[in-house]
UniProtKB/Swiss-Prot annotation:
Gene coding for it: prsA
UniProt cross-references to InterPro entries, sorted A to Z: Foldase_PrsA, PPIase_dom_sf, PPIase_PpiC, PrsA_foldase, Trigger_fact/SurA_dom_sf
Molecular functions (GO terms): peptidyl-prolyl cis-trans isomerase activity
Species, as recorded: Streptococcus agalactiae serotype III (strain NEM316)
Protein name: Foldase protein PrsA
Keyword annotations from UniProtKB, A to Z: Cell membrane, Isomerase, Lipoprotein, Membrane, Palmitate, Rotamase, Signal
Length: 309
């Protein structure tokens, strides 16, 4: 089952321990779950057997985060938003949605709770990120910011072909735009791009190479590897226009705000600090040694010892 964002990586499946924890308030640890000739299996027997498994550890973590964030931010996420996200995912899977849920060990309600918890954490992280919009952070973001650059790009799938095309575009009188349209292997045949340093329309390696060029400059072959398919692509870039960077960071305040918020909300360390503070505020304490380490990734600030035991 695909999750909504990187934040969702910590919220996988609500499995046996979560169910058992819900039941334990109604039954005694000595309650028989299974009976047989000469023996029984009690709630306590089952709990002791499964609690150290990876699935149980993840389930307990999910249950803790769900309870903590629902208590602190529950009114910030409506049932309507959860349903909309759920229905969007269901529509994407089509007729295979039920089987996808089943394979992930989820019920519809369990998945909705997962979505809700993810949204609650996302809200908390976004609110914390807004507090990072200080003048110092704006100035730091400005230092690393490059304004809009216009380029023509040739994408190729083979290195030898890319080297051959590079010779063509660097020949005297070569029409880069014409060659780009003829040679690019991009599925959409797009060759014209505009982007700043916060853009995502092209691989970072390609944008970095473009920023180093002067206007009308042509790059050497730039190779990139797709992190999903591990396929290597090759690019040749020509800069057709460059915007001069203004001296006052306030000229880019709105764009820099987007950059700061995006950097913070996608930073796993920042996310963990936000979660850590929420856990500390809730005074979460682990009473069963079997789960002693499940919150260790969030014990990143002083005073976090209560998250460990």
């Amino acid at each position: 089952m695909k999750t909504r964002s990187k934040l969702a990586a910590g919220f996988l499946t609500l499995m046996s321990v979560a169910t058992l924890a819900a039941c334990s308030g109604k039954t005694s640890n000595g309650t028989n779950v299974v009976t047989m000739k000469g023996d029984t299996i009690t709630v306590s027997d089952f709990y002791d057997q499964v609690k150290t498994s990876k699935a149980a550890q993840q389930s307990m973590l999910t249950l803790i985060l769900s309870r903590v964030f629902d208590t602190q931010y529950g009114d910030k996420v409506s049932d309507k938003k959860v349903s909309e996200a759920y229905n969007k995912t269901a529509k994407g899977y089509g007729n295979s949605f039920s089987s996808a849920l089943s394979q992930a060990g989820l019920t519809p309600e369990g998945y909705k709770q997962q979505i809700r918890t993810t949204m609650l954490v996302e809200y908390a992280v976004k609110e914390a990120a807004k507090k990072e919009l200080t003048e110092a952070n704006y100035k730091e973001a400005y230092k690393n910011y490059t304004p809009e650059t216009s380029v023509q790009v040739i994408k190729l799938d083979a290195e030898d072909k890319a080297k051959s095309v590079l010779k063509d575009v660097k020949a005297d009188g070569a029409d880069f735009a014409k060659i780009a349209k003829e040679k690019t292997t991009a599925t959409d045949k797009k060759v014209e791009y505009k982007f700043d340093s916060a853009g995502t329309s092209l691989p970072k390696e390609v944008m970095s190479a473009a920023f180093k060029l002067d206007k009308n400059g042509v790059s050497d072959v730039v190779s990139t590897v797709d992190s999903t398919t591990y396929k290597t692509s090759y690019y040749i870039i020509k800069v057709t226009d460059k915007t001069e960077k203004k001296s006052d960071w306030k000229s880019y305040k709105n764009r820099l705000k987007e950059v700061i918020l995006k950097d913070k909300t996608s930073d796993r360390s920042f996310q963990n600090k936000v979660i850590s503070k929420a856990l500390e505020k809730a005074n979460v304490k682990i009473k069963d040694k079997a789960f002693a380490g499940i919150l260790s990734q969030y014990a990143t600030t002083s005073g976090s010892s209560s998250l460990k035991k």
